[in-house]
């Protein structure tokens, strides 16, 4: 059966106390909205509709950058979740499959749970996602009639018996596309807030003799984020889950609580990740690599057997082939490093291609920016770059070439050539002692004057 997603992302997020729309606050390196979109994408939806409101332009930009086919609609007035869902009606015109309504601030609903919701919708007119709450607090309660969902009761309206129910409402629903909007049309705003609530479609459906079912999930999947405190708790939950997954996939983390993963980090088995490593978005680490302490990686690929760090930074576009070494205080950006090449200390390699088994000495800098444009540096195979070499791009260093320490290389270097570019050394006997004596005399004179 075909599915469509409606993701509600119109809320202001007042408790965030931020100019940024709530659904765009980052969790593990990606906006909350993107987490919801990724989870929903597991269903292979034929249409994805994002209901934007507060900060609609920013929400639209983020959504379309992740999925260019997403349909963006606006809720110009925030009149409740039912009213928000109704804004998707035109975008889903003629769609008769299952519509799943998610929330942009609820990032952890799993693909397995979404699949179960869609399966349940084949035999029920309305499906609600519920959870057994450890502390039901003020959640809405799901009142069952045997296997059927009879009604949803908000905490403030519940009797003592209903408040004792621990099966709670997550807010996520699924319904046939045509029927969803028929039910929403009948929902009223006769409540204290004067809003139209999405869960009220259950009462409308039951009054019409339709069926309603509940699919349950772990409470952790339903975590909604409305404040910085809840965002922090969600980050902690994500990181704990990511570390557990890493262990299960054969990754060694001697100090797991100090390693920070992004939402899309991929790490191969038999990789060692030392303490205080941070992964930004877009990192792939192959099997058998080592990421040493205090390194920061984003938008990069590290192949099998490579060693990164300690205190290294790999920026977007860094591509390390097998058995590469990138050592302490080395930064690599938009550069491909060939097999067996070593950049062991205190260097910047940007906008460059390095061949195989090349050695880059300490203090080497690719001078890639002229103040307006970036330029490329090409270094061949089996090259030796002497310490403190400045490579002024655009420049090419041929295979088996060498550069002398302290050189400023501004022109291409032929294969097997030695390139030197520095002033000749001048030695003046006894001059060091004379200079020291002059300086000491000057210092003594200054002290007498004070």
Curated annotation (Swiss-Prot):
Obligatory cofactor(s)? Mg(2+)
InterPro entries in the record: Bifunctional_GlmU, GlmU-like, GlmU_C_LbH, Hexapep, MobA-like_NTP_Trfase, Nucleotide-diphossugar_trans, Trimer_LpxA-like_sf
Give the residues the record marks as binding Mg(2+): 105, 226
Q: Where is the active site?
A: 345 (proton acceptor)
The record's region (Pyrophosphorylase) falls at 1-228
Q: Spell out the molecular function terms from Gene Ontology.
A: glucosamine-1-phosphate N-acetyltransferase activity; magnesium ion binding; UDP-N-acetylglucosamine diphosphorylase activity
Query: What is the recorded name of this protein?
Result: Bifunctional protein GlmU
Source organism per UniProt: Roseobacter denitrificans (strain ATCC 33942 / OCh 114) (Erythrobacter sp. (strain OCh 114))
Q: Which gene encodes it?
A: glmU
């Amino acid at each position: 059966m075909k599915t469509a997603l409606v993701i509600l992302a119109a809320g202001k997020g007042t408790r965030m106390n931020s100019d940024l729309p709530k659904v765009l606050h980052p969790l593990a390196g990606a906006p909350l909205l993107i987490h919801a979109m990724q989870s929903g994408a597991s269903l292979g939806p034929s249409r994805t509709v994002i209901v934007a409101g507060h900060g609609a332009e920013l929400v639209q930009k983020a959504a379309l950058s992740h999925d260019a086919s997403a349909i963006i609609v606006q809720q110009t007035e925030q009149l409740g979740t039912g009213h928000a869902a109704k804004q998707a009606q035109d975008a889903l015109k003629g769609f008769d499959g299952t519509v799943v309504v998610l929330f942009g601030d609820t990032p952890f609903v799993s693909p397995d749970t979404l699949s179960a919701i869609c399966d349940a919708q084949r035999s029920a007119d309305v499906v609600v996602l519920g959870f057994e709450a450890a502390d039901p607090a003020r959640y809405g309660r799901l009142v069952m009639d045997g296997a059927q969902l009879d009604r949803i009761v908000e905490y403030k309206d519940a009797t003592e018996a209903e408040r004792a129910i621990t099966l709670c409402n997550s807010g996520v629903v699924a319904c046939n596309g045509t029927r969803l909007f028929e039910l929403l049309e009948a929902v009223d705003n006769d409540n204290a807030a004067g809003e139209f609530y999405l869960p009220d479609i259950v009462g409308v459906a039951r009054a019409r003799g339709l069926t309603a079912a509940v699919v349950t999930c772990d409470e952790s999947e339903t975590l909604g984020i409305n404040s910085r405190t809840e965002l922090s708790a969600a980050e902690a939950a994500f990181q704990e889950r990511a570390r557990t997954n890493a262990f299960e996939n054969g990754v060694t983390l001697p100090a797991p609580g100090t390693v920070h993963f992004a939402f899309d980090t991929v790490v191969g088995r038999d990789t060692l990740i030392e303490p205080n490593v941070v992964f930004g978005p877009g990192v792939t680490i192959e099997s058998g690599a080592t990421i040493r302490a205090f390194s920061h990686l984003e938008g990069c690929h590290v192949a099998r057997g490579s060693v990164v760090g300690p205190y290294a930074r790999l920026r977007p576009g860094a591509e390390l082939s097998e058995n590469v070494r990138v050592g302490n205080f080395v930064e690599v950006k938009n550069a491909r490093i060939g097999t067996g090449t070593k950049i062991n200390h205190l260097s910047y390699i940007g906008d460059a291609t390095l061949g195989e088994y090349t050695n880059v000495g300490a203090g080497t800098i690719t001078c890639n920016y002229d103040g307006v444009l970036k330029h490329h540096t090409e270094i061949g195979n089996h090259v030796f770059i002497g310490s403190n070499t400045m490579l002024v791009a655009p420049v090419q260093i041929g295979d088996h070439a060498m550069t002398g320490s302290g050189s400023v290389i501004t022109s291409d270097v032929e294969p097997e050539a030695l390139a030197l570019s520095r002033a000749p050394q001048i030695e003046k006997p006894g001059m060091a002692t004379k200079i020291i004596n002059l300086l000491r005399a000057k210092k003594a004179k200054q002290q007498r004057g004070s």
